[in-house]
Amino acid sequence: MRILVAMSGGVDSSTAAALLAGEGHEVIGVTMRVADYSDAARGRSCCAPDDVEDARAAARRLGIPFYVANVEARFRERVIDRFVDDYVEGRTPNPCVACNTEVKFDWLLARARALGAKLATGHYARVEERGGRRRLLTAADPAKDQSYFLYGLGQDALGDVLFPVGALAKPAVRAEAARAGLAVAEKPDSQEICFVTLGDAGDFVALRAPARVRPGEIVSTAGEVLGRHDGVHRFTVGQRRGLGLAGPAPRYVVRLDAAAARVVVGSAEEASRDRFEVREATWVSGAPPGGAVELRVKVRHRHEGERGTVRARAGGAGAEVRLARPVRGVAPGQAAVFYDGDEVVGGGRIA
């Protein structure tokens, strides 16, 4: 089988390539160049120059062809610009979801198909055929599971993608990399947003859109002015740290009013929600569930999930979510992903 492997230069995707090559497949390595990095940014994140060279070295070690695909324009339009727009408009984006949906499993998958190949990545997730359809499942290692970022994959895509490390725990992946003689076997995992190479997300947004960043007031839910801020792009709903406010009780961001350049803060209870709407919903099966269904809902990657009822809106492009109990930090713009046991049912952007 011919398989195109998306190689980021990390241990997971390099091991995915090694496992597939070891099974005798015709493996082709490719790294996506998503941004123009300066020398100062080297080594900070995946897909930076040093990582491209790590991917190239892994491919050389495995004896497979290797290419670099320039996707800067598409990535800028579909991921970076949306990231900036969301932050300045008071939402909390999830660029990894956008990258997977709009670039990796769209543009790159199309290139793989043009070569008569499947597409493999180093994601920790699994795909299985059950009941006559393809199902997206959580990884065998719960601590590394990345299915949250993949909810946008439908039946068509799942038929042509492979997740070779999804059934392995991280130590086993590193052991396989060492066995294959890969220099990245002990390379640390990337923790940063891949295109934010200097500073944090707030600094990145301020540099990309300085004219759209406005200082403003930090106010209580009762309207009392408590302080000032440098821009709503530096905050997210549910945030506690970094508010710069004194007081006997902790305060959390309750909502962001970008139009008024106002950050509203309150108690943990006020920053929690048990009902919300989801927009831009997609369903792995290709069709929304009928009526109200009981599912586990994750409102961010590291969230264990909360039991709730999900009711798809007419047409399936949206959904109403009612949680069994309030959850703090249900941030507009973030992904809400729905699970039935170990199966990803679908997801969308929190309204």
Curated annotation (Swiss-Prot):
Protein name: tRNA-specific 2-thiouridylase MnmA
Location(s), subcellular: Cytoplasm
PANTHER family hit by this protein: MITOCHONDRIAL TRNA-SPECIFIC 2-THIOURIDYLASE 1, TRNA 5-METHYLAMINOMETHYL-2-THIOURIDYLATE -METHYLTRANSFERASE
Keywords recorded for this protein, A-Z: ATP-binding, Cytoplasm, Disulfide bond, Nucleotide-binding, RNA-binding, Transferase, tRNA processing, tRNA-binding
Keyword RNA-binding: yes
Leader sequence segment: none
GO cellular component terms, A-Z: cytoplasm
Entry's EC annotation: 2.8.1.13
GO terms for biological process, alphabetical: tRNA wobble position uridine thiolation
Chemical reaction(s) catalysed: S-sulfanyl-L-cysteinyl-[protein] + uridine(34) in tRNA + AH2 + ATP = 2-thiouridine(34) in tRNA + L-cysteinyl-[protein] + A + AMP + diphosphate + H(+)
Superkingdom in the source lineage: Bacteria
Family of the protein in this entry: Belongs to the MnmA/TRMU family.
Main location: cytoplasm
Role description: Catalyzes the 2-thiolation of uridine at the wobble position (U34) of tRNA, leading to the formation of s(2)U34.
Record-listed ATP binding positions: 6-13, 32, 122
Entry's Gene Ontology molecular function annotations: ATP binding; tRNA binding; tRNA-uridine 2-sulfurtransferase activity
Entry-linked InterPro entries: MnmA-like, MnmA-like_C, MnmA-like_central, MnmA-like_central_sf, Rossmann-like_a/b/a_fold
Disulfide bond annotation, renumbered to this chain: 99-194
Cytoplasm in keyword set: yes
Annotated active site: 99, 194
Site feature: Interaction with tRNA: 123, 334
Residue numbers spanned by region Interaction with tRNA: 144-146
